[in-house]
């Protein structure tokens, strides 16, 4: 009760500072919007990139990076998008389809009409998704498009290169992409000090400091897609993709100080996998208001891993993993006059067979079947807009004699009050049951070092989460800003649990424990100092978490910020970005993911764009992470450094050529994907 009162006081004290007249917001389909760059809605905002932003960008990562979306770190160097607030994952879509790196690099930013940034996803998006970015294009692809995107680090061995092409004739379109990326670095090192409380009460200390390391990996991804579109009434799309990843002979040499002994220990890891994926999609406009969409994805993953570590005594195991899954989904939508109604059914079946050989001998066979149904309505009663949704899942799970049936539920309600043309207040409440990731439900047991083991727990049950979100936003033609309060209560979550054996070995697993609570208050602002020429943006706030285990209570407060400045100078673009990283406490682990800063300059010449970036400047030994374990019997402090990611200078060259007639591409409303191989590491 005290936490709820504190939460309310913080929210209302934060929200007491908005009142002034504003210009009228104008939003028109397929029309350049001059009066407002951002339009707020119940589940997020619609962003209309300016012509300057589109002209200065060479792919989707580039244009999203310039928008400085709150709580997201968008890196056009590594082609990655991550949430820095630990609320969940980020889902990227183009015209409704969940896409990957190849589609993000191939899309021409000049074809973007708007970007739908959903920071409050509805029930149809499923579990674990905190943010959805849907990039909506004008769907006017040319008769053919060919291009390439080449990125290479100049200060270390790291690269990411892709070529792509698209050809269309009549109602048909064929597209292909191939991407190869890799790295080889020797500057990844960590320092760790661990204190173990033994059965007799003595403190036993071990120091583990890296003195030499090698990290290398190469990945190949190829995708072939055929699309047939009959105007907008019927769409059929089939794609076949394949991924191959190989990380051979990575090793680390550690200097071990173990009591009175000092010696060298070596860890060696190998990882190889390949995965073909077949994706079939169908859309039919039944009537002007009704539509039905179906999607089916079949995935096969083959994984071979090997791990060796000789701290204390040699320990080696291999894993031969096979995973097959079939994911299907059907969605019906009806745009009624008072509201829009949508309902859908999603079924996923997954079979995993992981054979642990060597010192970690175990054979795990898992069958996981999940049936998810949802219904949602969205409507408007001026000056209010609302969304009501309900999802329910039935999960059937078997593994090596363990058998469980779960029902999980996901209700959600949102209400938005439009105070005036530029200011709105919104509130969202949702409940959600979450299932632990598959690897931790395995019954395999793997040694981490001479004192520690990791053990799966097939008896894990879903946790029960409740979220409250209150936001006030204010927009004008040059200023976009909001303040938000967020409170999350997790009941019976999967939390860390450590056990000490009679022979002084320490076992890490997860069990359902009491509760985790999170309070987050933050603000965001973006302002055009010079319209279409100079833009600044910043966001920041305070994060407070409470972890209540059966035998521990840990609380933690942290603050965060991110800011950027971008100048559009004709064919030149200059950009700077900085954030202070991500600090969190979950269970008994306090963590920090490193701060990030970058300076960029780009130049556009005809169909070519050249970009030069300098990431983490003046940091020759970049601090990439820090972890502290707070268990009563184990205290560990680990700091990781990366020379490769400090003072990282990268060059990007992109080229795109489009010619020919127009073709309406598929607006894929749903998409399914599976990448989890269920292996404990």
Predicted features, each with a name:
Residues 51-53, 142-164, 639:
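Short strand-turn segments of transmembrane beta-barrel domains in outer membranes
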Residues 404, 423, 433-482, 489-491, ...:
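Outer-membrane beta-barrel signature, preferentially recognizing the C-terminal barrel domain
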Residues 30, 60-63, 80-82, 102, ...:
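N-terminal periplasmic accessory domains that precede
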Residues 20-53, 77-78:
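Short, acidic, small-residue-rich periplasmic hinge/interaction motif at the N-terminus
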Residues 605-681:
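C-terminal beta-signal and adjacent terminal beta-strands/loops
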Residues 150-154, 169, 180-184, 242-246, ...:
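Transmembrane beta-strands of outer-membrane beta-barrel pores
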Residues 73-120:
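Periplasmic plug
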Residues 219-247, 268-402, 406-411, 418, ...:
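Face-selective signature of the C-terminal outer-membrane beta-barrel domain
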């Amino acid at each position: 009760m005290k936490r709820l009162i504190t939460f309310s006081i913080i929210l209302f004290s934060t929200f007491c500072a908005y009142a002034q007249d504003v210009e009228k917001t104008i939003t028109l389909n397929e029309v350049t919007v001059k009066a407002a760059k951002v339009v707020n809605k119940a589940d997020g905002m619609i962003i209309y990139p300016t012509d300057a932003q589109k002209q200065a960008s060479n792919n989707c990562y580039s244009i999203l990076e310039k928008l400085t979306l709150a709580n997201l770190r968008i890196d056009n160097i590594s082609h990655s998008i991550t949430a820095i607030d630990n609320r969940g994952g980020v889902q990227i879509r183009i015209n409704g389809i969940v896409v990957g790196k190849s589609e993000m690099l191939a899309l021409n930013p000049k074809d973007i009409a708007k970007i739908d940034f959903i920071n409050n996803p509805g029930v149809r998006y499923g579990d674990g998704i905190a943010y959805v970015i849907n990039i909506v294009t004008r769907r006017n692809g040319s008769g053919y498009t060919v291009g390439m995107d080449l990125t290479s680090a100049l200060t270390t061995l790291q690269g990411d290169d892709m070529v792509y092409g698209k050809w269309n004739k009549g109602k048909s379109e064929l597209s292909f992409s191939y991407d190869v990326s890799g790295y080889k670095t020797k500057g990844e090192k960590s320092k760790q000090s661990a204190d173990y409380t033994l059965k007799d009460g003595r403190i036993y200390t071990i120091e583990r400091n890296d003195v030499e390391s090698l990290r290398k990996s190469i990945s190949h991804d190829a995708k072939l897609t055929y699309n047939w579109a009959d105007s907008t009434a019927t769409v059929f799309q089939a794609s076949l993709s394949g991924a191959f990843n190989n990380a051979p002979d990575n090793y680390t040499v550690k200097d071990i100080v173990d009591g009175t002994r000092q010696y060298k220990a070596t860890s060696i890891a190998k990882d190889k996998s390949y995965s073909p994926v077949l994706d079939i999609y169908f859309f039919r406009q039944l009537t002007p208001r009704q539509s039905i969409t179906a999607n089916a994805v079949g995935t096969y993953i083959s994984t071979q891993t090997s791990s060796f570590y000789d701290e204390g005594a040699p320990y080696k195991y291999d894993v031969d993993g096979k995973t097959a899954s079939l994911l299907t989904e059907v969605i019906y939508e009806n745009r009624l006059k008072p509201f829009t109604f949508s309902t859908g059914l999603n079924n996923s079946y997954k079979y995993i067979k992981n054979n642990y050989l060597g010192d970690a001998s175990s054979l795990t066979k898992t069958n996981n079947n999940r049936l998810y149904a949802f219904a949602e309505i969205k409507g408007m009663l001026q000056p209010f807009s609302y969304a009501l949704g309900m999802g329910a899942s039935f999960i059937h799970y078997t593994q090596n004699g363990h058998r469980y049936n779960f029902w999980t539920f996901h209700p959600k309600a949102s209400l938005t009050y439009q105070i005036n043309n530029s200011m709105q207040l919104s509130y969202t409440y949702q409940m959600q049951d979450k299932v632990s990731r598959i690897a931790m439900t395995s019954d395999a047991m793997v040694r981490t070092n001479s004192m520690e083991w990791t053990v799966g727990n097939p008896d894990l049950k879903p946790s029960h989460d409740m979220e409250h979100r209150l936001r006030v936003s204010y927009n004008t033609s040059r200023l976009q800003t909001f303040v938000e309060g967020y409170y999350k209560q997790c009941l019976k979550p999967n939390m860390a649990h450590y056990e000490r054996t009679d022979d002084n070995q320490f076992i890490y697993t997860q069990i359902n424990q009491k509760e985790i609570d999170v309070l987050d208050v933050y603000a965001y602002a973006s302002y055009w100092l010079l319209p279409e020429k100079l833009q600044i943006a910043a966001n920041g706030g305070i994060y407070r978490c409470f972890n209540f285990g059966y035998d521990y209570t840990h609380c933690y407060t942290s603050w965060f910020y991110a800011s950027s400045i971008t100048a559009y100078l004709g064919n030149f673009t200059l950009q700077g970005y900085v954030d202070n990283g991500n600090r969190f406490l979950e269970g008994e682990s306090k963590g920090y993911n490193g701060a990030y800063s970058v300076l960029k300059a780009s130049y556009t010449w005809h169909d070519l764009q050249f970009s030069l970036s300098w990431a983490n400047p003046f940091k020759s030994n970049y601090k990439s992470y820090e972890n502290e374990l707070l268990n009563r019997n184990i205290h560990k402090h680990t700091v990781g450094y990366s020379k490769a990611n400090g003072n990282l200078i990268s060059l990007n060259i992109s080229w795109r050529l489009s010619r020919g007639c127009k073709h309406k591409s598929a607006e894929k409303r749903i998409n399914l994907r599976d990448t989890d191989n269920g292996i404990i590491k």
